[in-house]
A protein has these predicted regions:
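Bacterial N-terminal signal peptides that target proteins for export
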Residues: 1-13
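Bacterial N-terminal signal peptides
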Residues: 11-23
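Acidic, serine/threonine-rich low-complexity disordered tracts
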Residues: 28-126, 164-263
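Acidic/charged, solvent-exposed loop-and-adjacent secondary-structure segments enriched in E/D, K/R, S/T
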Residues: 131, 135-151
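Hydrophobic, aromatic-enriched interface-forming segments
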Residues: 156-162
């Protein structure tokens, strides 16, 4: 049971890469529409694994209230539900603090997955161009991993870039390369706008554009797989559906938008 749920959390993180800012890496035409960026928003998703209701996810975005972190904060909460939760309980929280230009400053993860409990802190320093990664095992009360990684001056975590893509107009047939780091590894990953589709999810029926992020197959992760996201084809560019297709032993993980909260 741990394998699918660990991949679900990674899927949530990876899928948000589609929304990392393209800036000078873009290879297609994508005019910016800054009006699409909300001041505050909450998006709630159902999580399905092998056609079973497996969990819930909530993604929130807001201006950062901390004076030392002028910019934005992104929060992701993931929890297992129903029958899955009885066998393998998951309760994960991810927080990313971003500068006003959306470059990541630091991330904090509290992961409770079955008997596994980990806390991970990553600090990104644009001056030294280093990321400092520290992972603690909360059960054994020791340091599981500590390392330093080279990064570019502006880099993006796999969660925090979500809302920037919604300021762009990346049309089908165009792609972008973006710098991404999880604190352990830094890569340049391709994101491709593929085609327009109309899809139905619990939150309603949406006209969308489907994107693929090429993160598997030894890019950011070694596992073979495909990562897709459907953004609404309108000014809001809501992440309506997220899907990770992995090898047969794990299967397909799908997130579908259930509710949008905005102010």
């Amino acid at each position: 049971m741990p394998g699918p749920w660990l991949d679900t959390r990674h899927a949530l993180a990876l899928v948000i890469l589609l929304c990392i800012p393209a800036q000078s890496f873009q290879t297609g035409s994508a005019a910016q529409n800054t009006g699409a960026l909300p001041a505050k928003e909450g998006l709630e998703y159902s999580v399905e694994w092998r056609l079973i209701d497996a969990g819930k996810a909530k993604l929130t975005w807001s201006a950062n209230a901390q004076p030392s972190h002028a910019g934005w904060q992104v929060n992701l909460h993931l929890e297992s539900t129903g029958l899955i939760s009885k066998f393998y309980k998951v309760n994960d929280d991810y927080v990313a603090n971003l500068a006003s230009d959306l470059c990541v400053q630091d991330t904090h993860v509290n992961a409770h997955e079955g008997s596994r409990q980990r806390e991970t802190l990553v600090h990104y320093d644009p001056e030294s161009r280093k990321a400092n990664y520290l992972e603690r095992d909360l059960v054994k009360r020791n340091v599981a991993l500590a390392k330093e990684t080279d990064i570019p001056r502006c880099v993006h975590d796999v969660i925090g870039g979500l809302f920037f893509l919604r300021t762009l107009n990346l049309e089908p047939g165009h792609s972008t390369e973006v710098p991404v780091s999880d604190g352990k590894k830094t890569v340049s990953a391709k994101v491709e706008a593929q085609r327009r589709e109309e899809i139905k999810v619990p939150a309603g029926t949406f006209k969308t554009i489907r994107y693929e992020a090429f993160l598997f197959n030894n890019v950011l992760y070694r596992r073979d797989g495909h990562l897709y996201v459907w953004l609404s084809d309108d000014r809001r560019k809501l992440p309506v559906r997220i899907q990770v297709r992995l090898q047969f032993a794990i299967g397909t993980i799908t997130l579908q938008l259930e509710k949008e909260e905005k102010t």
